Amino acid sequence: MQCALYDAGRCRSCQWITQPIPEQLSAKTADLKNLLADFPVEEWCAPVSGPEQGFRNKAKMVVSGSVEKPLLGMLHRDGTPEDLCDCPLYPASFAPVFAALKPFIARAGLTPYNVARKRGELKYILLTESQSDGGMMLRFVLRSETKLAQLRKALPWLQEQLPQLKVITVNIQPVHMAIMEGETEIYLTEQQALAERFNDVPLWIRPQSFFQTNPAVASQLYATARDWVRQLPVKHMWDLFCGVGGFGLHCATPDMQLTGIEIASEAIACAKQSAAELGLTRLQFQALDSTQFATAQGEVPELVLVNPPRRGIGKPLCDYLSTMAPRFIIYSSCNAQTMAKDIRELPGYRIERVQLFDMFPHTAHYEVLTLLVKQ
């Protein structure tokens, strides 16, 4: 992938950009095999990759510069701002949005937040696009509600320029820290969720719900999990750390009982909406802590699917699963180091199958799907 920002030394986020994709995949596979070297693996499936540029469905832009000439991008460690509107990871459809946002920031008087001076209002612009219909969600992260009335007043101009903006919100993040969002979300549009569709499964994206940033690879990840589950004798499963329900909604059949657990209530609202659309009445999604939910249960289903954050599932859940011994565990991980650590805490399970998904090209990161079977 050619990147003028990288070539000019202005951005180093894609540290592997000079390596061809096959070399990147080989290095990631070697890393994964090294991490799982202590465990016999019955089947290594071929790694899955997607487009090498224009694949991201989300932009998280730090707003800097002045209200008349805002910059959208990032801050270097020394505080120097960098405009990243031309980043080739973003699809071409993002360019006109960035182009319209810059004059809009001036029109609405949204002074960019100055980290050094702790002054200003507009901290971040968060943009998400649906692959299914091209609809977009735009979030303005502000320090306070001071400029909210001005923003509302100027908004019709922006909506006229960009009719693809289906969901627009203001998020209030009052703390002087590099935290992307606060708890308060103010909707400026009637529509509150973005419709997405992977493999004929309706999914919903709400402002404060996690959603995979590489749809081409994520849809293959979910489809693979579905294929693996369909090969197993499973009538009841848990989907822990389920997010908007991507795994559970793909894996469920009309006669299967499924419980999905996720701490974020916004994500659970999305999952429930999808389940209702699919007419799956035996799916239950609850906004709870996954570990606390699981360890309070007196029995387990045949299959437990886990998709934890980077820290992994942790010892308490590993101990519980070891004791309760579900027949199958499917572990989806964005951090193979913590996954390997967790598998060590699951004695009595063998690794039936492993597959790497290149969700983050040009970086050392990857996603991995692992099927564990009770010995």
From Swiss-Prot:
Transmembrane segments: none
Keywords for the protein's UniProt record, in alphabetical order: 4Fe-4S, Iron, Iron-sulfur, Metal-binding, Methyltransferase, rRNA processing, S-adenosyl-L-methionine, Transferase
InterPro entries noted in UniProt: 23SrRNA_MeTrfase_RlmC, MeTrfase_TrmA_AS, MeTrfase_TrmA_CS, SAM-dependent_MTases_sf, U5_MeTrfase_fam
CDD domains, sorted: AdoMet_MTases
Positions with a binding annotation for [4Fe-4S] cluster: C3, C11, C14, C87
GO molecular function, one term: iron ion binding
One GO-annotated biological process of the protein: rRNA base methylation
Record carries keyword Lyase: no
Catalyzed reactions: uridine(747) in 23S rRNA + S-adenosyl-L-methionine = 5-methyluridine(747) in 23S rRNA + S-adenosyl-L-homocysteine + H(+)
EC number from the UniProt entry: 2.1.1.189
Binding site for S-adenosyl-L-methionine: Q212, F241, E262, N307
Alphabetized SUPFAM superfamilies for the sequence: S-adenosyl-L-methionine-dependent methyltransferases
PROSITE patterns linked: SAM_MT_RNA_M5U (PS51687), TRMA_1 (PS01230), TRMA_2 (PS01231)
Catalytic residues of the enzyme: C334 (nucleophile)
Keyword Ligase: no
Family: Belongs to the class I-like SAM-binding methyltransferase superfamily. RNA M5U methyltransferase family. RlmC subfamily.
Function text: Catalyzes the formation of 5-methyl-uridine at position 747 (m5U747) in 23S rRNA.
Protein name per its UniProtKB record: 23S rRNA (uracil(747)-C(5))-methyltransferase RlmC
Biological source species: Escherichia coli O139:H28 (strain E24377A / ETEC)
